């Protein structure tokens, strides 16, 4: 990729999608800090420039190509092998991770699916109370019994879950007024049969492999193609080379029976398969939860 091509890509992304600028520093000296506008992303291919970007607290993506094999490019968690890796979502993720902003996963007509922040603690505790007899509908584990314990759990979850695994449980928000409606997202799924699972009151459903084809929109670039040394940790291989996840949701009572789940689950599944690279997505539902079973079978 030469500088002209890089600048064309930058202009396209900046004008159509972003409120920040992408700066390409390919095989050249690092410019003066004053040359960078606010909200910059840096793409470079030299170790020394990666270190300078870090020194100035700028989010940086490494670019590996045939002419820089001697560079380690280990100074950043972000790496691409070609310009196809520069998808809008990926660039937005780099920006949000660096500046510790909640990442918007997807939107629908009525809902925004976005990473949680500590501002949602009161609503998450309300959801916990409404589901005190239904642990699968809770965000916090059952051993979080005090406000302080719940607050600490949420802080640690936000700090570690999204950045390390690349996915997690997200908040569902109203598009018009940002009202918190509930939670939905992914958790690791262990496909292990034990006496407990055989006697469980829950049923497991494998989400249709073709469900994502029902969702319009351009296919996103799989992040595993442009992740760095964390790739093997983010994308472990399960038995039979499957990368599985469990999807779940829980909606506050006042927003139930309004089609929220049926609206947010298809685009969320599409995101899981097309961007996160899940080969199998399952959900666990109580046997007497007829509405959720019917939704899972759609």
Residue spans of the language-model regions?
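Asp-based, Mg2+/Mn2+-dependent phosphohydrolase catalytic module
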Residues: 1-106
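Short hydrophobic clusters on alpha-helical segments that form packing/core surfaces
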Residues: 29-32, 268, 272
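Short, high-confidence coil segments that cap the C-terminus of an alpha-helix
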Residues: 37-39, 167, 278
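Conserved catalytic-core motifs of GNAT/GCN5-like acyltransferases
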Residues: 64-68, 191, 284
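Conserved acetyl-CoA-binding loop-helix of GNAT-fold acetyltransferases
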Residues: 249, 257-271, 290-297
């Amino acid at each position: 990729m030469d500088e002209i091509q890089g600048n064309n890509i930058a202009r396209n992304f900046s004008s159509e999608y972003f409120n920040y600028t992408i700066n390409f520093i390919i095989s050249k000296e690092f410019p003066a800090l004053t040359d960078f506008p606010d909200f910059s992303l840096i793409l470079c291919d030299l170790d020394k420039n990666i270190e300078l970007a870090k020194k100035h607290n700028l989010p940086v993506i490494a670019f590996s190509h045939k002419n820089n094999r001697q560079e380690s490019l280990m100074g950043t968690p972000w790496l691409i092998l070609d310009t196809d890796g520069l998808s809008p979502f990926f660039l937005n993720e780099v920006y949000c991770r660096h500046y510790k902003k909640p990442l918007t996963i997807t939107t629908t007509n009525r809902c925004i699916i976005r990473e949680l922040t500590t501002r949602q603690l009161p609503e998450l505790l309300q959801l916990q109370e409404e589901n005190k007899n239904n642990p699968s509908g809770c965000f916090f584990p059952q051993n979080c019994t005090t406000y302080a314990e719940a607050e600490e759990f949420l802080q640690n979850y936000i700090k570690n879950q999204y950045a390390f695994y690349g996915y997690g449980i997200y908040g569902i928000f109203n598009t018009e007024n940002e009202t918190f409606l509930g939670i939905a997202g992914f958790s690791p799924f262990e496909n292990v049969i034990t006496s407990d699972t055989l006697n469980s009151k829950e049923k497991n459903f494998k989400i249709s492999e073709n469900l994502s084809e029902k969702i319009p929109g351009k296919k996103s670039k799989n992040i595993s193609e442009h992740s760095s040394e964390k790739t093997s940790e983010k994308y472990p291989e399960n038995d039979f080379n499957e990368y599985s996840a469990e999807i779940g949701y829980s909606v506050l009572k006042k927003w139930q029976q309004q089609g929220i789940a049926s609206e947010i689950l298809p685009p969320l599944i599409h995101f899981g398969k097309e961007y996160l690279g899940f080969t199998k997505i399952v959900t666990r539902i109580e046997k007497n939860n007829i509405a959720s079973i019917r939704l899972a079978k759609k």
